[in-house]
């Protein structure tokens, strides 16, 4: 028993001597710093492990044929996109960031910072990914591109019958579902611009809008999808002094699927606030058919009536046919679009044919 006590005392003496040697010249403040540094490193490692990042992308090769005066050179083109998504948990909420980059990283094409608050919904700041009323600007079914895609002064500019008062850039976005109905609202202050950090945009009207979407389960109709939305661009303010009142955007759609066939119909109105502004009324329909799990075809028509306040109204009439074949990550798609009285110009016609091969990864 006494022999074991001697061994224990000897070990304590050796450990005490080693600690004195190691800590010689180090005060308690230094020891605290070492401890805090180690703790901070542990916390950083923990946060990094809690985050997830994914990368996706696509490459698109196209052949485009338009009017003889529009395509006079090489009709082939290519586009590549990369999208980065990062997400992690902060105080019980999921914070995620999305950014898509243009060809050769020439710049940011869209970005989105969002906070998923569970039952309280999702709050986001959007720089081009899609929010509010713009998410249902054209819901008619198609196998490839929309009826207006690729035509002169097409709806991608935000005019020509496509609703979306707040737009997609520089907007705050809130999404939540109540009783089977999804609310998607957007609001911006001033012009809708993709500002970088520390920057501000030029003058422009503030705007807000929302979209409501649901399915047919509330009505006992499987295969039915419904939606409607409304928005205003506020004019006559310091930011936008255009006289005549606010711009109003509204739309409603219904799509019904039965087996391999989907039919959709949509109406929209854009009432301009300016005294001499041109209002727009839109009606469109589309029919899509899935031949099998790989092949689909579609056809649709779209009319836009331009209500000219001091001239005869002009009705733009467009139609388009599309086909798409998917095999794994590869997709081959083609569409042919035509329009008469294009963009409120009587007698002006346009046409576009495109064949595209894309690879997703």
Predicted regions and their residues:
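Outer-membrane beta-barrel proteins
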Residues: 2-361
């Amino acid at each position: 028993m006494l022999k074991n006590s001697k061994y224990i005392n000897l070990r304590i003496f050796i450990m005490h001597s080693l600690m004195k040697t190691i800590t010689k010249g180090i005060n308690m403040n230094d020891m605290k710093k070492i401890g805090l540094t180690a703790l901070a490193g542990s916390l950083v490692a923990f946060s990094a492990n809690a985050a997830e990042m994914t990368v996706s992308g696509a490459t698109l090769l196209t052949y485009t044929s338009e009017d003889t005066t529009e395509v006079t050179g090489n009709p082939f083109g290519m586009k590549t996109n990369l999208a980065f998504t990062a997400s992690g948990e902060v105080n019980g909420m999921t914070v995620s960031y999305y950014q898509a980059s243009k060809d050769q990283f020439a710049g940011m094409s869209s970005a989105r910072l969002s906070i998923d608050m569970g039952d309280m919904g999702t709050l986001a700041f959007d720089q081009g990914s899609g929010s509010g009323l713009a998410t249902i600007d054209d819901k008619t079914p198609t196998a490839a591109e929309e009826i207006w895609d690729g035509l002169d002064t097409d709806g991608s500019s935000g005019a020509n019958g496509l609703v979306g008062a707040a737009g997609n850039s520089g907007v705050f976005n809130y999404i939540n579902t109540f009783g089977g109905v999804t609310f998607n609202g957007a609001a911006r202050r001033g012009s809708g611009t993709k500002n970088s950090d520390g920057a501000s945009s030029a003058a422009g009207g503030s705007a807000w809008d929302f979209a409501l979407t649901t399915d047919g389960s509330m009505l006992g109709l499987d295969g039915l999808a419904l939606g409607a939305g409304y928005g205003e661009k506020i004019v006559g303010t310091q930011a936008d002094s255009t006289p005549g009142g606010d711009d109003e955007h509204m739309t409603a759609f219904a799509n019904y699927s039965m087996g391999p066939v989907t039919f959709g119909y949509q109406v929209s109105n854009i009432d301009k606030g300016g005294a001499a502004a041109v209002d727009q009324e839109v009606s469109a329909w589309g029919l899509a058919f899935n031949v099998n799990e790989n092949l689909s075809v579609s056809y649709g028509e779209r009319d836009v009536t331009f209500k000219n306040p001091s001239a005869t109204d002009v009705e733009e009439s467009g139609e388009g046919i599309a086909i798409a074949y998917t095999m794994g990550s590869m997709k081959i798609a083609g569409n042919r679009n035509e329009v008469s009285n294009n963009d409120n110009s009587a007698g002006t016609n346009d046409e576009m044919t495109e064949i595209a091969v894309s690879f997703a990864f």
